[in-house]
Design a protein with these regions (language model features):
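Glycine-biased, small-residue-rich flexible motifs in mid-sequence functional cores and linkers
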Residues: 1-20, 98-271
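Short, small/acidic-rich helices and loops at N termini and domain boundaries
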Residues: 1-102
Length: 271
């Protein structure tokens, strides 16, 4: 379901031409080529992203990709239309922010595998959102967990600290909602494309974040990507990367939360 009927102003990348941006976006659809391999290709082709996209098998091997990745890329590339993808984003008024744009969040840029492209619905404010804290926890929240989460989220919002979370049931939804109710900012990081809100029960909350002007939905996944289980660790690293710290208000011994807090500690900001 689309949540950006009345979005903030659409803008393409400020650092790339539309043709270049189309290829950057197209690469986000290629399974097996993430931020590290994409940077490898850009380095080899001297920032000529069109050359990287259209490279032959031998050139891709010389760039450092292994055989299975090359074969997979060539198969996926054959059914891709970079210009059409960009036109769809523009039609839906999705903001596209690349790692080279000034609008790209400064904290996120510091992590080792920062997303090359962010898809955004709503409003990111680079300066204000640099003061951000992640609030995460269980989906099966207790009355005490709700109370504590509301207390912290309200205090942070009133102190002009952006609340970052993952739009999940439980702690995430409470954190987002409380921040909005307190007049603060909140960023919801998704494990799917912007057109697939998960869980669907939080579609109203997602829409409120976008339409309020108090925050944004953010994802590295292109339109149409469903919330597969493997996407959640990637989502969590973005929550971590956007945040000055992570607050777990209530959680079982849950792998996802453990990975998220461990990921934050591994960043140089936690040194």
């Amino acid at each position: 379901m689309e949540v950006f009927d009345e979005p903030s102003s659409y803008y393409p990348s400020e650092s790339l031409s539309l043709d270049e941006l189309a290829y950057w976006v197209a690469f986000t659809r290629i399974l097996g080529i993430g931020p590290v391999r994409f940077k490898m290709l850009l380095d080899y082709f001297h920032d000529d992203v069109a050359a990287a996209w259209n490279a032959n098998w031998k050139e891709l091997a010389q760039a450092g990709l292994d055989q299975s990745i090359i074969d997979s890329f060539i198969r996926q590339r054959a059914s891709s239309n970079p210009q059409r993808e960009l036109e769809k984003l523009e039609r839906l008024r999705v903001q596209v922010i690349t790692i080279r744009d000034n609008a790209y969040p400064s904290l996120l840029k510091e992590i080792s595998n920062a997303p090359t492209v962010l898809y955004v619905a709503g409003t990111l404010k680079k300066e204000e959102d640099s003061f951000a804290l992640g609030i995460v926890g269980t989906r099966k929240v207790s009355a005490y967990g709700r109370q504590v989460t509301e207390q912290f989220a309200r205090g942070l919002a009133q102190g002009n600290v952006t609340v970052v979370s993952g739009l999940a049931h439980g702690i995430d939804a409470i954190a987002h909602t409380t921040a909005l109710n307190a007049g603060g900012r909140t960023i919801a990081v998704m494990a799917s494309g912007l057109d697939i809100i998960y869980p669907s029960e939080n579609t109203g909350l997602a829409r409120r974040i976008v339409e309020s002007g108090q925050g944004a939905l953010v994802t590295e996944f292109p339109l149409g990507v469903k919330p597969d289980s493997k996407n959640f660790p990637a989502r969590n690293r973005i929550i971590s990367g956007l945040s000055q710290g992570i607050l777990v208000t209530e959680a079982p011994k849950q792998k996802g939360v453990t990975q998220l807090t461990a990921g934050w500690r591994r960043s140089h900001r936690a040194a």
